[in-house]
C-alpha cells in the first residue's frame, strides 16, 4: 500500500511539474566596500571614490588671462621697485607669485601686508591714476643704490621728499587727494626711519618729524624712529609702508615735515581674479579652476586630500584618503561553494534548484540591468533584466555625486603664513581656525557619504521589493511563492507568458482554470505524502498486534492439549 502511495505521488508530481519564474539582482564576484550610518564595510556592486588624490604638478592656465610675476612680489606692483616695472599696471584673472618674488628694494615692510595681499590677489589687476601732487621748497628725486635700474633710483610709484639742501629746513606741507572714481582707491605711503639721527638731520633738517594722515574713516600719526639697524642691501635705514582704501568722493590728506615717502599714483582694482604663490610651471594646454602651491587639482569629486590650502573652485579638503560612495546595490555574490551546489542541483532540479533569489544571493552576469528575472518552462530557461526598476533606481542614485559637490564646493581664499611679529597672534588664530574647519569637514564628509550610502542600499532593496510585489499581484492564486524569490506557476507558461509577467501585462484570468486544476492535484499529492509516515507506523503496529494475537492463540491451544504447562509459584 505504501508503495502504491509513493508511486502515485511521484506520478502526480511529474504530471503537474510547475513552470517557474524567479526574481533577482545583479551581483559581482568582487564588490566594493562602503560605510553606512549603521554598518561599516558593506559590500556593494558599484561605488565611486569621492576623495581626489591626483595632483597635476603644473599651473593649468588654458583659457585664463594669466600673469606670472616672476621676481616681482604682488605688493611691489603698487609701489614699483625695479623688478616690478613691467607690472605697475596689469589685468589678469589668474595671478602667479613666485618664491623668488620681492615686494621691495629698500629694506622695510608693509603694515597689515597679508590683508593687502588678499585684496590684490582678488583684484583682477590694477590700474593707476596720478594724484596730482606738486612740491616746492623740497627735492623730489631721492634715490638709493638699493633700488638700481641702470643706476641708483627709487620706487617708481613713490616720491622720496628731501630738504632742498643737506641739513636744510624741511617745510611743513599738506597735500590732499579726492577720489572721484566710482570704486575705492588704494593709497600707499611710507615712513622713512633713518639709520641714525645725523642721517635724518642731513635728509630732513633738525627737529622732531611727524606725519599725519586722515580721511573720513582713517586718522593716524607717525613719527620716524632713527637708529642703527643691521644692513640689508647696503642700507641700515628702513621704510615702512602703510595703506588705506579710499571710498569714492572721499578725500585723504597728508600733513608732514619730513621723513615722508609720498604716493605719486593711486591704484584701482580692475575686477576679480585668483592669486596663488607657487613655483609650479605654467601649462597653457590644460584647464583648471583649483590651484595650490604644488599645482592644479582637476576633479569633479566633492573632496580632496591633496592640499588643505587650495584656492578657487575646489573640492573640500578632508583628512580621509578615501570615502567610497555607493552607486549600486548591496552585493551578495555567489561563492564557490554556492556555485558548485548550484551546478549540482541544476542536474537534479533545474536552473533554480540552488538559487536563493534576492533574499540570499545575487546573480552574477546580469549585466543588462540591476534587477531581473530567470524563468524555466517547457521551452527551456532564460534570463532578462527589468529595465523599468533598474532605471527607477538609477534615476534616484544619479546625481548623488553632484549633490555632494553642491553641498561642499565654494571659492576658497588662501591666507599665507607670512605674518610679521605683530601679526603672529592673528596668524595663529587663522591656522587654528583652518585646522578646526578641516576637522569639521572631515567629519561632515564621512557623515554625508554614510547617509547617501544608507539611502542607496535602502533604495535598491525597496526597488527589489516593489518588483517582487508587482509579480505577486499579477500571478495571484495562479502561482505559489517558494520563499526564495521564486514563484511556481500552476499552469503552462511559455516564453510569451513569461514576457507578459515581466511586462506587467499578464492576465491571470486567462490561466485561472488550468492553474486551479493543477493546484488541486499538487495539493493532493502533498496531502497524501504527508500521511505516509502515519500509515507506516500504523502498519507496523498492526503487524505487531497480529503477531502477539497468534502467539497467544498458539499458547492457549498448547495448554489445553497438555502440551504446555504453566506453573505459578508464590
Curated annotation (Swiss-Prot):
| Pfam families per UniProt | Hemagglutinin
What's a single GO CC term here? Answer: host cell plasma membrane
Q: What is its main location?
A: virion
Recorded GO terms, molecular function? host cell surface receptor binding
**Keywords, in A-Z order:** Clathrin- and caveolin-independent endocytosis of virus by host, Clathrin-mediated endocytosis of virus by host, Disulfide bond, Fusion of virus membrane with host endosomal membrane, Fusion of virus membrane with host membrane, Glycoprotein, Hemagglutinin, Host cell membrane, Host membrane, Host-virus interaction, Lipoprotein, Membrane, Palmitate, Signal, Transmembrane, Transmembrane helix, Viral attachment to host cell, Viral envelope protein, Viral penetration into host cytoplasm, Virion, Virus endocytosis by host, Virus entry into host cell
Give the Cytoplasmic compartment stretches of this protein: 555-570
Q: Where is the lipid attached (S-palmitoyl cysteine)?
A: 566, 569
Transmembrane residues, as ranges? Answer: 534-554
Q: Where in the cell is it found?
A: Virion membrane; Host apical cell membrane
The signal peptide here is 1-18
Highest taxon of source: Viruses
**Positions marked as site (Cleavage):** 349-350
Q: What does this protein do?
A: Binds to sialic acid-containing receptors on the cell surface, bringing about the attachment of the virus particle to the cell. This attachment induces virion internalization of about two third of the virus particles through clathrin-dependent endocytosis and about one third through a clathrin- and caveolin-independent pathway. Plays a major role in the determination of host range restriction and virulence. Class I viral fusion protein.
Tell me the protein family, please: Belongs to the influenza viruses hemagglutinin family.
The record describes its quaternary structure and partners as: Homotrimer of disulfide-linked HA1-HA2.
Could you identify this protein by its name?
Hemagglutinin
